[in-house]
Amino acid sequence: MSEPQRLFFAIDLPAEIREQIIHWRATHFPPEAGRPVAADNLHLTLAFLGEVSAEKEKALSLLAGRIRQPGFTLTLDDAGQWLRSRVVWLGMRQPPRGLIQLANMLRSQAARSGCFQSNRPFHPHITLLRDASEAVTIPPPGFNWSYAVTEFTLYASSFARGRTRYTPLKRWALTQ
């Protein structure tokens, strides 16, 4: 029997937007601001599942495959910091309804399948920096990245040789 894996559902960023965000982050945040999230690990988490058995992963994948949700456009136009969790994030002022619906469906399915789900409201974001123990200056509004979201992904998270790696396991297309 295989070992449980640490899993989550997420939305990827297109490579060109990921590169622009990395450049923007390097321009606006000094190295001491926090530990930058690796470019390949930038994503928007929809539902964190925790440690999941192969059997539960299969069941969650079947449920995810039944979702019929239209695609939507994400506009990343907001940033902030959560001091308690020591995170600097990039997000959106007005999350699209489709994003909220997709996250709610996945979180609800996860909870019904026995995966703990936080009772805190969903705050869609992309983590830019971790271990940001001091308050940082957030760049003024004016940045804006938009892209069409056409799929979501199930990821496995692993830690080896001092690095976190997110491996895509399966993708599902959103309807047109």
Swiss-Prot record:
rRNA-binding among keywords: no
Residue window of motif HXTX 2: 125-128
Cystines in this chain: none
Molecular-function GO terms, alphabetical: 2',3'-cyclic-nucleotide 3'-phosphodiesterase activity; RNA 2',3'-cyclic 3'-phosphodiesterase activity
Positions of the catalytic residues: 43 (proton donor), 125 (proton acceptor)
Entry EC number(s): 3.1.4.58
Residue positions of motif HXTX 1: 43-46
Residues passing through the membrane, by range: none
Keywords, sorted A to Z: Hydrolase
Keyword check for Hydrolase: yes
Protein family membership: Belongs to the 2H phosphoesterase superfamily. ThpR family.
Family matches, as PANTHER family: RNA 2',3'-CYCLIC PHOSPHODIESTERASE
Protein name per the record: RNA 2',3'-cyclic phosphodiesterase
Organism annotation: Escherichia coli (strain K12)
Gene: thpR
